[in-house]
Design a protein with these regions (language model features):
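A short, conserved structural fragment
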Residues: 44-54
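Short amphipathic alpha-helical interface segments
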Residues: 2-37
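Short, hydrophobic-biased segments on the C-terminal half of alpha helices
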Residues: 40-41
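Accessory beta->alpha helical hairpin/"wing" motif in late/C-terminal subdomains of nucleic-acid enzymes
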Residues: 53-69
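Intrinsic-disorder/low-complexity regions
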Residues: 1-2, 60
């Protein structure tokens, strides 16, 4: 990971509330193959993903997760 990307991630993380940080920790600790609908819902609530038909995709600014499904 290059320095610019790391700096951007730190900036994003610093802007998260404590609840958002907790949810992000849960997401990071989960294996992608066991992501539940509830957890995917948290990603949407946090603005980390958006619903696109039957799948979840990264937000348009590309700051976060890529496609989940």
């Amino acid at each position: 990971m290059d320095d610019a990307t790391l700096a951007r991630l730190h900036s994003v993380y610093d802007g998260l509330s404590l609840v958002q940080r907790h949810h992000l920790k849960v997401i990071v600790e989960s294996r992608p193959e066991v992501l539940s609908v509830t957890l995917c819902g948290f990603l949407v609530d946090l603005g980390l993903a958006r619903v696109d038909g039957e799948s979840f995709t990264a937000t348009d600014d590309g700051r976060y997760v890529a496609s989940l499904f």
